[in-house]
Curated annotation (Swiss-Prot):
Protein name (database record): Triosephosphate isomerase
CDD domains hit by this protein: TIM (cd00311)
GO aspect biological process, one term: glycerol catabolic process
Gene encoding the protein: tpiA
Protein keywords: Cytoplasm, Gluconeogenesis, Glycolysis, Isomerase
Subunit structure: Homodimer.
Domain of life, source organism: Bacteria
HAMAP family in alphabetical order: TIM_B
One Gene Ontology cellular component annotation held by this UniProt entry: cytosol
Protein species of origin: Haemophilus influenzae (strain PittGG)
Active site: H104, E176
NCBIfam families named among the record's database cross-references: tim
Binding site for substrate: N10, W11, K12, G182, S221, G242, G243
Length: 263
């Protein structure tokens, strides 16, 4: 089946109110006529309100609803209560966020988030009607040891074991080899395709229907120079973009490359 690609910008710990407004204005100008590709941005959570306001009333052919959708970089497993500093799925929903990144290697590393904890976040998002963007991927040492498939399977199975394979209906997986994140080193299109095909096949072993519809993005030093070649691969359904998403022209090139390659 034809899958609609998704290109999502992960701003990480970058930005300000002024930066958010300026970047979104640039993105609206660049992307107002893009079709055939879903687009989302995940600014820091305190700027979601600014972003929501900046995205509304763009005045183009979208009828006041921007082609760019909102996302977020994290979520807590709790809905409310005495959980200082945390953000719930319902709060994200209240700001119009749809695509929520979970399991990013930076969260797994710096905040010691386990596969099982990430699976709980996945479940919380599904229950709230939001779209989990599940990041998976291996370290450089694991890659060199030939453990890429083992690591990816383990991270996917944590969700399947907790929620069932059907939980991946309407969800997104982002394969991000840790050794490629922010390093300038990207997997080759063939390398990325091999892992994406494995991921889809691993899910297909449980459900072919779920595997055929799940969006599998590539992430890890995706930029305006390498995106088009990555998107020629049949199992790469878009990208989770870091640094290049902070510049409207570069991010627009990536989005347009996905739209052109998949339509």
């Amino acid at each position: 089946m034809a899958r609609r690609p998704l290109v999502m910008g992960n701003w990480k710990l970058n930005g300000s109110k002024a930066f958010t407004k300026e970047l979104i204005e640039g993105l609206k100008a660049e992307l107002h006529d893009v079709t055939g590709c879903d687009v989302a941005i995940a600014p820091p959570v305190m700027y979601l309100g600014t972003a929501e306001a900046a995205l509304s009333g763009c005045g183009c052919s979208c009828g006041g609803k921007s082609v760019i959708q909102l996302g977020a970089q994290n979520v807590d497993i709790n809905v409310k209560g005495a959980f200082t500093g945390d953000i719930s799925s319902e709060m994200l929903k209240d700001f119009g966020a749809k695509y929520i990144i979970i399991g990013h290697s930076e969260r797994r590393t710096y905040h010691k988030e386990s596969d099982e904890f990430v699976a709980k976040k996945f479940g919380a998002l599904k229950e709230a009607g939001l779209v989990p963007v599940l990041c998976i991927g291996e370290s450089e040492a694991e890659n060199e040891a030939g453990k890429t498939e083992e690591v990816c399977a383990r991270q996917i199975d944590a969700v399947i074991n907790a929620l069932g394979v059907e939980a991946f209906n309407g969800a997104v997986i982002a394969y991000e080899p840790i050794w490629a994140i922010g390093t300038g080193k990207s997997a080759t299109p063939a390398q990325a395709q091999a892992v994406h095909a494995f991921i889809r096949g691993h899910i297909a072993a449980k459900s072919q229907a779920v595997a055929e519809q799940v969006i599998i993005q590539y992430g890890g030093s995706v930029n305006d120079a390498n995106a088009a070649e990555l998107f020629t691969q049949p199992d790469i359904d878009g990208a989770l973009v870091g640094g290049a998403s902070l510049k409207a022209p570069a991010f627009a090139v990536i989005v347009k490359a996905a739209a052109a390659a998949k339509n």
